């Protein structure tokens, strides 16, 4: 038995203790009011974790209010472990995106791996089997020839290995994602992990603890000291000395999680439990307080009953450890042994560590001695909200309607196609198992959205993650609108109707008034776009304090759009299909280069107005595309993105490298620089001749510009003055990124 006298007495140096726990004097005054006495160290640690930015959203919550969260197909919106939408045939999709930025910068492999593990637990804790994963990862100047580039290539390799190793061991396919490189991430990379699962509509479980006397059961890996202070660490800034917090990074074991997953799914088939919650950030503290808080209950925990991996652990460590692969269950009274037997069958630790009470109080005991007593509602539901100061940043109003370069269109094309931003990332996604479970239709690198079929039905789900952080830096509100629209458009081009989004809002320091103004603007942009596009927000995550040595990242709202197609045979390809088919531009190319990839690469900096977006026009384009794909008019489609029309056509020609590329002959009659303009609400479609007039009429009905620009065919890529062989394009597109990564090996 570990002596805990030092944890129960009066805190001697309160100022230093508050500093270590990232609590303010005002926080401490509030704690005194709640407890009506000074806290002991255990209680102070619990308050620090639950009131951290990571757990409480104290700086951001006020701006999230007003997100559209309801629709006839929404079963569960924000507030639970994940969002849920009805996809028909008594099935629901459960999904969420979440950040694991700070841990991944400190220990890239472990940080990324546990990020994947944590988001998977959020999904299967609701009764769903995970069936697909995505990721959005962002690094600094990876092309730098010095130590900075070497460092970020190391970080990239570690993150990719961590994502791949965990997902592959879990048997969950990683089917897509996005990757970006900007100097703003030099001191703070981003690793956002997304997971989607499927569950029957009448078999959903929630994170609640109710029913007086119901037992509270700990299941999963034993608790160690890894991850101590993780929630507080994730709510703090980085500096050049941040390597000292390695101990706050959790250590994952995907094999243990696989056993936990299967044991939980077996448990869900029987009527044995009331609720279940993942032990994520803040570990046993957050799971217990959140479960009881949602139900208005109290709870008693006997911490000496918690399975421990290390000797000499104390209540402070047990409550705040973020050891991975652990869950907390509220079982039905009298069903304890059946629950324990299921986990014993799967060789997963399980122990009864407490019970639900009616007190509304969390009471913690250590070998019969009460060591903490805290009102639950004050921590779980009523954390202090901060009204951080805002300072608007002038959105640039001058138009960037041309690229300041003397390069020809051919030279610009070659530069962009081989750039680290555009070049194919098969070195990355080849490390992910994208075909396990045998449901994948379009894996990473094969389509604008990634798609899986829904077993036992004729339907398929699409999912895509997107955010152009340069746009959000220059114009946060409209940049966020573009992120929502683009993520949904990626599903549209493959034939699926977007139904809902999950967002991961990555920002710098909330103490910087300009950062909080950008946060407010981004939230407003998301609200407006989701309302017009009818894609409610059902889950999400906020990650603040993404800055290092005073340098904030660009505002980066990673948006995942999830869509549904009723007939899997109507999925539209993103690559050229048939020689002789016509190519059509839907939408209008405009001279808008502010924040574009071409501007960044060719001019060395970004400035000016970002591409404009008309959400009503965007929605009309979606409806046109859904009609056309449903009537099987489209052979292929791809939206115009980074690099403009020329790069979009190049990707359609080259595909993912597994099939023979097909050339094209295109004459746009556009000024040459406009071939690289990333205009919004624009899609290239491949159409057989017999469907051309019908599609043209439909475009007219929806008031969408329709321009025939050429045809598919040949072994030359010819787009206006760009004329290049497919072999040369393949070399640039498929080898550039791999060469960059290989230089350190």
UniProtKB/Swiss-Prot annotation:
Pathway: Purine metabolism; IMP biosynthesis via de novo pathway; 5-amino-1-(5-phospho-D-ribosyl)imidazole from N(2)-formyl-N(1)-(5-phospho-D-ribosyl)glycinamide: step 1/2. Its EC number is 6.3.5.3. InterPro entries: PRibForGlyAmidine_synth_PurL, PurL_linker, PurM-like_C_dom, PurM-like_C_sf, PurM-like_N, PurM-like_N_sf. The lineage of its organism: Bacteria, Pseudomonadati, Campylobacterota, Epsilonproteobacteria, Campylobacterales. It is found in: Cytoplasm. Keywords: ATP-binding, Cytoplasm, Ligase, Magnesium, Metal-binding, Nucleotide-binding, Purine biosynthesis. One of its GO terms (cellular component) is cytoplasm. Mg(2+) 1 binds at residues 98, 541. GO terms for biological process: 'de novo' IMP biosynthetic process. It catalyses: N(2)-formyl-N(1)-(5-phospho-beta-D-ribosyl)glycinamide + L-glutamine + ATP + H2O = 2-formamido-N(1)-(5-O-phospho-beta-D-ribosyl)acetamidine + L-glutamate + ADP + phosphate + H(+). Belongs to the FGAMS family. This is Phosphoribosylformylglycinamidine synthase subunit PurL. NCBIfam families: FGAM_synth_II (TIGR01736), PRK01213.1 (NF002290). Part of the phosphoribosylformylglycinamidine synthase complex involved in the purines biosynthetic pathway. Catalyzes the ATP-dependent conversion of formylglycinamide ribonucleotide (FGAR) and glutamine to yield formylglycinamidine ribonucleotide (FGAM) and glutamate. The FGAM synthase complex is composed of three subunits. PurQ produces an ammonia molecule by converting glutamine to glutamate. PurL transfers the ammonia molecule to FGAR to form FGAM in an ATP-dependent manner. Mg(2+) 2 binds at residues 122, 278. The active site is at 54, 100 (proton acceptor). Substrate binds at residues 99-102, 121, 250, 322-324, 543. It is an enzyme of class 6 (ligase). It comes from Helicobacter hepaticus (strain ATCC 51449 / 3B1). Monomer. Part of the FGAM synthase complex composed of 1 PurL, 1 PurQ and 2 PurS subunits. One of its GO terms (molecular function) is phosphoribosylformylglycinamidine synthase activity. ATP binds at residues 57, 96, 503, 540.
